[in-house]
Amino acid sequence: MDIEFVRSRFIKHFDGKTGNIYFSPGRINLIGEHTDYNGGFVFPGAVDKGIMAEVRPNGTDTVMCYSIDLKDRVEFKVGDPEGPRATWARFIYGMVQEFKALGVDVKGFNIAFAGDVPLGAGMSSSAAMESCFGCALNDLFADNKVSKWDIALAGQATEHKYIGVNCGIMDQFASVFGKEGKLMRLDCRSREFEYFPFDPQGYKLVLVNSKVKHELAGSPYNDRRKSCENVVTALGKHFPDKKFETLRDANWEELEAVKAEVSAEDYQRAHFVLGEKDRVLAVCDALVAGDYETVGQKMYETHYGLSKEYEVSCEELDYLNDVAKENGVTGSRIMGGGFGGCTINLVKDDLYETFIENVTAKFNAKYGHKPEIYPVIISEGSHKVC
């Protein structure tokens, strides 16, 4: 993000005075998909694309907001019980309300912000906004005494209460806690986490956005969650002396023991979840050893599981995965909930240009539009820039 670009817009729209500048990143999730609601592990990292905001207290009880990208301006009172209608401004309003609930005496301020997180690419621009605004509020009104976890939770609460999205905690966590050159294994049950090195010399990490999103009949995500719950119920009945809260508590032998007691569909979905738990742990070990070939192998295994067992892929994503294999890409998989969106790819430097040319040309020839290409670097989390 260009600091001078944001600053020039802030000065133009707010009486010529400057404020403080803050940045919060989007995120990728290298591996660990559909594991959060099963009490498992996710493995995100912050990236070098995000949201930048300039903020300055204005001595009133009014928050004056300007979206540089949308060229839209909104104002609201700090104590307004309803808040603004514009969705983008409700992210700011929600964070103000959540900080007030934490006991922070938030006053009026001016804010202008812009982002370079590609929309629809699964890098969580919304969490980057919440984290950026939270970082600013913490610095300006709380003397940086609000914990990182509380900032992340305030972002999650903003989505739940003011945007109407029932998200998990991974996106906000990654944006707030990210570190340059580090991925984070987050235990979605205990919220304990650990940093792991990600410095793939000789490789690039790149997202390929299919730009398709399939709207399916029914509630495919809820259906898969219900499948997992069905298997947990069967496990509890079969093993009455053991407590099963989620599939996190099951091992392979226990899953096989209830195979005949659940539907084939529920079994294969649970099979994916147990396999994904093992793959996350294997990738952590591989990163410590600097073994990026194993990391890539596990990414391909996850894609296969998401496509054939969990059944959240689509023709376009499977095609991107196939083209990656044909071009010698070290690892490739669906990133995100599925049914469209991106693949995340680990590509050797000397194959990168050829892969990008081939995947762009082949996908365009087959589907009539070019995919979007986003190389990313694992970067620092939310911080004050200047």
State what each model feature region is:
Residues 1-27, 52-85, 182-331, 346-386:
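C-terminal nucleotide
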Residues 1-22, 28-32, 37, 41, ...:
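Gly/Ser-rich oxyanion-binding loop with an adjacent helix/lid
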Residues 39-46, 224-225:
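Short Gly/aromatic-enriched secondary-structure transition segments
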Residues 44-46, 54-57, 103:
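Short, charge-rich binding segments
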Residues 128, 342-346:
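FabD-like malonyl-/acyl-CoA
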Residues 339:
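Glycine-rich phosphate-binding loop
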